[in-house]
Amino acid sequence: MLKQVSTTLQVRAASRGLHEITDRIREWLDSERIESGLLTIFCAHTSASLVIQENAARAAREDLERLFEQVAPENPSLYTHNDEGPDDMPAHIRSALTQTQLSIPVQAGKMVLGTWQGIFLFEHRHSTPTRKIALHVIGEAQ
């Protein structure tokens, strides 16, 4: 039987950077009992994004954060848009260079992720507001 469901996660990161949300998504997906289908994850913000990234080695996430510090530095003289502080425009740049939506296949009731892959909220602001992450899955139910 075809089933389609959605929900919204509220996520508040403790700091700027990558914060794994795989388990929260997995718990919700398990509760919906979808055997095979497609999961869509959407971050409804312009200063945070979603990435699939290495989930075992913290150093990989730290290196990624350092790279983004170089690509989009907090330097007010570089930007005209700074309405919410020196991290405002760099946060928008970081978001533009990543993604706000992910599509992940579901097979045998599980997300199809590689061994070392995790789903992360990539928070680009220091103020770390609560983020809304929309989840939607469509597929064959158990």
Regions found by a protein language model. Give the residues of each.
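Active-site histidine-anchored catalytic micro-motif
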Residues: M1-Q142
